[in-house]
């Protein structure tokens, strides 16, 4: 099941709950950061793509997205990536050099003209904000990078 909620002004969360037998459930989150150049952080699970896209459309028209920030390339983060890139020719992906390499091994390699390579410590300047890539203190994938938004902290 995929739902959405507003976490803070200008930030919506799209959360998919995956049931894990005998262990409970796992929340898989993506985020929409609204602004002059809207950003989708991660794109949901491969298995839940249709549900994710329906919920995303309730938050923002995918044609209005300008960026996708891939925190990392695990399958629970790239599920709707190909569909979004196909539907929106102006959409660009922010990821690391290693992220591009890993995607090149998948059935959905990234076209380099639609990628902005960013590694931890580097900053992406958008129309209304600056995003500085940060490596979280704990992660399960060595290419994981979130960001610090200079507008929201």
Language-model-detected regions and their locations in the chain:
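Active-site metal-binding motif and surrounding structural segment of the metallo-beta-lactamase
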Residues: 48-94
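Alpha-helix capping at helix-to-loop junctions
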Residues: 90-93, 109, 153
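Short beta->alpha connector loops
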Residues: 45-47, 74-75, 136-140
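Intrinsically disordered, low-complexity boundary segments flanking structured domains
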Residues: 1-4, 119-121
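Metallo-beta-lactamase
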Residues: 95-144
